[in-house]
Amino acid sequence: MEVNDGERVVIAKPVASRPSSSSGFRTFTELLTDSVTVSPQTTCHEIVDAAIRPKTLRFNQPVAASVSCPRAEVKGIGNGMSCDDDSDSRNYVVYKPKAKLVSKATVSALANMLQGNRQQTWRQSEAVSYGKSVSQGTHRAGPNLVQKVPSFTESETSTGDRSSVDGYNWRKYGQKQVKGSECPRSYYKCTHPKCPVKKKVERSVEGQVSEIVYQGEHNHSKPSCPLPRRASSSISSGFQKPPKSIASEGSMGQDPNNNLYSPLWNNQSNDSTQNRTEKMSEGCVITPFEFAVPRSTNSNPGTSDSGCKSSQCDEGELDDPSRSKRRKNEKQSSEAGVSQGSVESDSLEDGFRWRKYGQKVVGGNAYPRSYYRCTSANCRARKHVERASDDPRAFITTYEGKHNHHLLLSPPSSSTLPFNSPQLSKQTI
């Protein structure tokens, strides 16, 4: 019992340490007493304060803060304060802005604006260099010619058959996606028989022609009368009411108030009349519409072609398998008529109204073949017209199918044809 009443002695295991010269040697009892009496919390806080101290980025303080710093040193030395402690409470906090989320439309719009500025700068530089080369005479043609055309936009049809700005007629026969270009490269060949010239056309994102590479040389002259570009002419897109003077003549044989049977007259200058007369004298007739003229012969009716070497052709109309099969069946079950005529006015009328939907160059004939369809609703009659290879002034017309309606136009006299009558030519053309 006496042992239990006595004071309990706590014995702590001493930690081995090397003696230092400053503290000297100490006895085991002193070391034991120090280990029991020392507060572990104070030692822990001192170690943590010495080990973990955040590093801050300080900016230059105003003059007032720097002036007040010595006062803090004088007054706060006894309290353990310093100039650094005072400046810690006055630090400036810099906030970094956060990025905002924007929609995809905004991002694409900004990208297009940036790309547009780059394209405009490139075009201006290319235009200046191209103008200098032309003025100095260094831009000459050759067998393999590379042309930079930054400002020209070449529109093409579904098949790419188009008379381009160089004066020749081209037919697109393929395209391929190449590295380093977002748009595919188009391949063209000259439509003239036995002409080996080909060209490659590369376009920019906006659709403009950026590079044209020619291969070979033309073995023929430029076509004398290329067809007008379909993109720039709105004259073949419909009909409208003719002037009253034309309706009073009764040249079309219909009611003058009926807009369906009235051709579209668009040229109103004497210069265009002279140019049209010159074209007719050369055997090349350019008309924006198809109109009716009487025939004096007993052969099957025919119509005229434009007579120009162009390879415009609606691929959707000519190369559609279902349409081609239907035309073959109609051709076998119907009476196909073939007639020949001349370029005179009496060879351009068969009493029906036709709409030209394409033309293409066929093998063995240097002149294109034109394709027409009847404008009447639900009528499947078609025809194609081509020039004779031996006689350019003769036409061969082939009809496919039968008309399921009566004549649309009454045959007028040949003197009422617009480009044969001087009176009508002066009033309407």
Swiss-Prot record:
One of its GO terms (biological process) is epidermal cell fate specification. Induction: Not induced by salicylic acid or wounding. It is found in: Nucleus. SUPFAM superfamilies: WRKY DNA-binding domain. Zn(2+) binds at residues 190, 195, 218, 220, 374, 379, 403, 405. Residues 159-223, 343-408 bind DNA. This is WRKY transcription factor 44. GO terms for cellular component: nucleus.
